[in-house]
Structure formats: structure tokens, C-alpha cells
Amino acid sequence: MAIPIPARPSGYRLGQVDAPIMVEMFLDLECPFSKRGWQNVMSVVKAYSPQQVRWIFQLMTLGNHRQSWDATKATIAVAGDDTQKFIDFVSYIFSRQEEFANEAWKDKTQTDFHHLLATFAVEANKQQYAAEATEYKDKAQFIDRLNSKDVYAQARIPARLATMRSVWSTPTFFINGAEATSLSSGSSLEDWQAVLDPLLSASV
């Protein structure tokens, strides 16, 4: 089935549209490698200006991560179209990842998880680094939004895009449309600089 044409391009975007380098990251919120990669990428984001690098973050769900789909929907419900809210909430939810890993959740239900996600949405606002992350103060309001058709439709787009792009593991990185196979979850700032700096020099 083809991807329905979205109202806006898939993913959360950071940086200027005319930046010479575009980095696209596919990540899974239940994946420990995505968590590690996210933490490293955040240091790379800070090292380059918006004029140098444009970032696109795409949420996807790996088949062996049962809670990832609802975590993805929760992030979309919280962030809306706001990239900074997305970054803040993803950072927060990764800090709580052990609480919804498969092993921790094997005897619990989807409804239980929805209530945990509602707690995340409320408590994220109390974190200093996520002070503006979420507007939700009422858990019932959040759960209604989480289960809405609109959020479901938005979450499907990057998931299908990942399939079309042959992304089967996370994190996966693309630079200017080409898969960056030399970069992984463990890549340091120096590793990223070794890839990005020559590209920036060539673009001048």
C-alpha cells in the first residue's frame, strides 16, 4: 500500500532548509541502541550551526519492540509540529526507557502502558530540560489524544517511509540521502566530525 500524501514532510526538522548537509536519523524509542545514538547525536547537533546541518528525525517501530508504537504515538501527541518539544520529550522518554522495555512489560497490558505514557506526558513538564515539552496536565486528555485517528495517521507515515527506505535497524543515518554506514549508535562527536567536516569543506 502506498504512503498517503502527508500534509507536511515526514519527520521533525531542525536547521535551515538550505543547509549544505542534511542528516536523517531513524530511531525506535524502545531500542537501547537508539537511546545511545540519540545521546551522541545531541552533542553533534550542538557542534554545528543550523546553517551548516539540517536534521530530520524519523520515529519507527521495530517488530520486536512491543511498546514502541504507542511510545511513538505519545511523542507525536506531545510534540505536535514542534521540533523542540519533540527533542525534549524524546530525551525524557529515553531517560525512562527501562520502565517500558519488553522484559519490564511482559505481564502488563496496553492500557497499563497508556497510563504510564500519560504519566510521562505530565511529569516531563517537571523536568528542567523539558520545561516546555508538554501542555498536558490531565492524563485523560492525553490518553484521548494518544488514541485519536489523527495521531495514528501521523505515526504511520514515518513507519511506512522506513520500510520504503529499507531501514530495518535503529538507529540508521542518511546524509544527503545516502545511508551513512560508517556511523552507528556508538559514533562519537569526533566520528561525526570526520564525516561531516569534509562535506562542509567541499560545499564552500
Language model features: what each stretch is:
Residues 13, 31, 64-65, 145, ...:
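A generic helix-loop boundary/linker signal
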Residues 15-18:
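Short, flexible hinge/linker loops that cap or flank conserved catalytic cores
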Residues 24-29, 35-121, 165:
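Structural alpha/beta surface segment adjacent to cysteine/selenocysteine redox centers
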Residues 2-5, 21-27, 38-46, 118-204:
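C-terminal cap of thioredoxin/glutaredoxin-like
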Residues 11, 54-55, 73, 135, ...:
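General secondary-structure edge motif
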Residues 1-13:
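N-terminal "domain-start" segment that seeds a small globular fold
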Residues 9-11, 21, 65-66, 79-80, ...:
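A structure-centric feature marking long, well-folded core domains of fungal metabolic enzymes
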